[in-house]
């Protein structure tokens, strides 16, 4: 190497200030520059020296000057603290790499010459050494041309280290000028900037400027003990340098740590995308206590026994990771940076996620009633996926058809749809609940095998492992689909058999047209023992009805969607670590930026991609015409979900057929009477319009389910808080209603207490206040109520009636004691029922419509939608894992409450009217009848009257179960015997009717046509003479923990 390469290039003056020309900068190429698409920088960053400081010491050297550098690359800004000695080290590293590469090139020439002479092959090679203890070992990447242009002149660094005599101000000023000049040297050329040495100096990596992971924070080499040896990119295990082995010990592994808003990621090296580990910060552990004002910390320095070791630890959830670096100063920097990244501010309801939509941040929501529209919307979203799909559920069936009739849409079967997307390169992550097989028959192992065999891009985990975790009683109950971090679906609908339904809630499908094979589902009659022959019927369609399914689901866009994705990532990583820690094909996931909570960012810009713009007046409501809250006529770009544009002509008329005169009519037939938009289509009652809303994700999780440091019960807190603050009206649909009053010590959730207190407050204030609750008429488990194998059904009935109407513990008993008959003015309970013929000219049958919704609407302004039931399992946080969303309207329509003007929310009001129109059998022109939900004309004369009339008709025609007049097991057996004698065959809940009624001689079908909608009264006195419905000692359920049932 010629000595002239060490001389100052043209443009450097004798005053020591570097003034590089563009030509000189271009000639200084970086060593080990990454080629092509592997570069970190694709344009030059900018750097400025903010300040220069000198130590307080008389023995001063310019090498001790400290520089605060502010750097900017595109929209990313970050600050570095560097000493002059580190800059000198950078310079020597660049020079050394140039020498090594030239020697390597000469060595190859000598090797070829010796080989051509046939003498011997050179053994060994130039060994690379690390520049400093926290550098990484990376392979060299160079070309012949790049070697020629890799000179970084040594004299360019001399002004930084040249001894300076004079006043401190002069030293600092000249140091600033010299440093700025040297920064200009290696920041003026992309090859130099993308070198390993410069990227390490700037503390950047592949993740630094990935916008989806948020702002640029601290990065650098650390060593960790909990990882195995890291394999290098060439297959060689990446170990510590020789001089570090004695320092750290062979069990410590060097990794590149990347701190981002909300998580700490450990990579193999800065230029590798391989994620070795990740800690997603657990906000619950940061809440602290009211007694202590000290801010809890994520990181803290560790006192090492060896004074030459410098360590710290990071704690999040149930994990603690120990790390080491090369100096005490770096430990302090890391501890400070991690604590700043996890700085906590409390969230409403104690949730991990903040309220979204307070500004115009893109938070939007859309509701779906029943599986028909929800499944089609999910299918549409999956079809348009481009990068990643996350899915989790209590039960998932790969052979589920997302659009019906099923024979017309084979490509929209779930497994086929996922296979298509996986082959297109979309990564699909599916998290299944691993059931206790003796208790449940959902066969998640079969689902896992089917899904794994689809394609290598489909990754599947089942969790928990019951033996190792000790978790036998609780389940993962969330129902989530997330597509490209852009849209997510949550609510009550699992992607499994039995859930697909329409507003008609047909009870028959013979021959199969809508519900193939085991999708013709009635768990009251029979649960399949095997799900492998999915197209084979479990039930005789000519004898047994299916059990119709009523549910509510929603889609979310914007930051709420990414909060849901953060929850999925947390659960996935927790399951991966516990279930498949050594499975290389199952990766860890990193949360995207919008999943990161604003408190992690402090005063930083919250959204790098598109900063949120505050509304002009966020407190000013947006008032819409009432019909806008129902219109589905938005442009396609506003609603990127599937809105059915036409109805299959034969779809509505096949199968049974419920022909009752009270059924909802086509909106088009009453357009002259309706105040709705003319664009309302046939499905107006099943899908809402995409709306700007305030949304907050709430959940139930704990250490076993998500690895959190303590249980989160934000769903429970949200329910209680919203009930307490309701002004006029609460509407609840839920699969269960099991709760306790304050004096209750068995049932621990306090939803019932909140309702009780709110009703008493309304009574004391003499104000109109209504609570309407819709739940299943019977638990959706196999077995007749009097059957020996139906202990689960009876146990659930026990706890539910204990909450609703039984003496001593129930809300109705306690309210009746204070209010008497006025109790029903405040609160009432209902169920849903449907009827039809099992096939053309077949028997008349009925079945309860199984209410599986997990919904609460408050004052037509706030809606809670999710997976959580009202029971201890779902609400306490330490049991089943759940997720939900509180949706608060930002756009309003004029309505009324008890005859007074009321601004109802577009989302909540339209959803409530959709549900009520379905339950009451209203058509489009009758929406005004339910505009005011609490006035007597609606609540008593329409809602309660319709339920009572329908109930009386069903009792007259079927004498079906449950029945207000059946109050003991003896009466139940008597009723069952009479029906079987008359009909010869009936269902487990007496669901078959004679063609003509002997009591009046009337045609049963004609009488049933007098019903309207599906609403019926909940039988409060059913089995009330049976003191205890809990399992007896001769039943296996007796030996199960009681908490399983409530």
Curated annotation (Swiss-Prot):
Cofactor binding remark: Does not require Ca(2+) or any other cation for activity.
Tissue specificity of this protein: Expressed in seedlings, roots, leaves, stems and flowers. Highest expression in roots. Detected only in the meristematic regions up to 4 days after germination and then at later stages in all tissues.
Lineage of origin: Eukaryota, Viridiplantae, Streptophyta, Embryophyta, Tracheophyta
Active site positions, chain numbering: 477, 479, 484, 852, 854, 859
Keyword terms of this UniProt record: Hydrolase, Lipid degradation, Lipid metabolism, Repeat
Disulfide bonds: none
Free-text disruption phenotype from the record: No visible phenotype when grown under normal conditions. Shorter roots less sensitive to exogenous auxin. Reduced gravitropism. No effect on root hair patterning or root hair growth. Defective in the hydrolysis of phospholipids, reduced capacity to accumulate galactolipids and premature change in root architecture in response to phosphate starvation. Decreased accumulation of phosphatidic acid in roots under phosphate-limited conditions. No effect on the concentration of phospholipids and galactolipids in phosphorus-starved roots.
Gene name linked to the record: PLPZETA2
All residue ranges annotated as the PH domain in the record: 215-343
Biased composition (Basic and acidic residues): 653-667
Pfam families: PLDc (PF00614), PLDc_2 (PF13091)
Name of this chain's protein: Phospholipase D zeta 2
Gene3D superfamilies found in the cross-reference section: Endonuclease Chain A, Pleckstrin-homology domain (PH domain)/Phosphotyrosine-binding domain (PTB)
Annotated region (Disordered), positions in chain: 653-677
